[in-house]
């Protein structure tokens, strides 16, 4: 077990490049870090252990030892974890880069074997080639990878993942890319590696190689917002941001393949890039479709639809003295956009409901209450039209000129009044709404705050470091709430 970790430890003194690349946290002094009780493979040292969340991508893929290095497979610094990472599609050329990297960093030849033999022979009772003392030489070259599926793109992190574990809570799945390369050619490469080993170790090497190289691939898992840590989320002025740490270098490469070519042919450039790299802190916005869905689900769960039959003049989120309508505590850590959407939706539905249904106060039990919750839950799904129609029908619509309409003569907020006029593109509001107008207003309120067609599926922490740098230079890495405030002040 942990052959990759042992190989990094023993091979780190072979060359100058090895000293820089094979310095992993699992072989350093342990610094206590809280565990998240998620068992899986650390993609940096490849050992099977309890994982914690990465500082760079907020996903659970790093062990309690390697977390101290603050490395992520999305960095642009050419450390070992980055060199083992490739984005889809996986080609034979990329797989050859992985094989060449393993052969460069972890060679097996008579000189290496004699070097390790001398080190081991310095200690008594270790004269034989026992597996426990020569585990670093039992490093077969396989093409297994931990795959992160970020909606439309996939990132493969190659490594020697030994053992078995339940992958239910892991953000990645282990796949075998041997069929994308050449089984017989990979077998030949490993036979040549093991030919220099003593006979007692050859059988162990061969057994380990065939066991790992013939593993079936797991079914890929789509990463969802629930897979990301909330520990690095901050809430400033009801705006959620995520703190992301990435390792940067000033050197650039056209592709990952060209980076590997420099590892083989231009080692000085790699060493310079490693020695001049720095750790950069990004404060990225957390506005994405996954978080919006999670917030809307929570909002629908805590929603108090009794507000639509009440006589409260305050916005729905500000009611605090009413046992049937109080949701004030829900918005303590919720996005300001969600609160504004909730207020406008419930104020509009309240005005429509009070205009058409003879209802007393917020303690009443109404058939429309479940539909209000459903409307929130379905506000960004394909079922929104059906839910709006059901809500419209419980407001006792009447038929006028062949169309079902509801009355509208209840007081509303000035800002909401102006917003509805903009949605309907009219100078004055009518005293009756058709189903199409009612639907347009509700959808317009939702889309003003959350236009799902423009949202990314996942947080920005899943993007490559180069893209984060570019977004920061363009001023697009944070939410535009402060810009909106500045614009409104300038208009006044």
Swiss-Prot record:
Interaction with host IRF3: region residues: 318-492
Chief location category: host cell
Family: Belongs to the rotavirus NSP1 family.
Compartments reported by the entry: Host cytoplasm, Host cytoskeleton
Name of the protein in its database record: Non-structural protein 1
Organism listed in the record: Rotavirus A (isolate RVA/Cat/Japan/FRV64/1989/G3P5B[3])
InterPro entries (alphabetical): Rotavirus_NSP1
Domain notes: The integrity of the zinc-binding domain in NSP1 is important for degradation of host IRF3. The pLxIS motif targets host IRF3 for degradation; however phosphorylation of NSP1 pLxIS motif is not required for its activity.
Region entry Important for cytoskeleton localization, spans: 82-176
HAMAP family reported for this sequence: ROTA_NSP1
Keyword entries, A-Z: Host cytoplasm, Host cytoskeleton, Host-virus interaction, Inhibition of host innate immune response by virus, Inhibition of host IRF3 by virus, Inhibition of host IRF7 by virus, Inhibition of host RLR pathway by virus, Interferon antiviral system evasion, Metal-binding, RNA-binding, Viral immunoevasion
GO MF terms held by the record: metal ion binding; RNA binding
Gene Ontology cellular-component annotations: host cell cytoplasm; host cytoskeleton
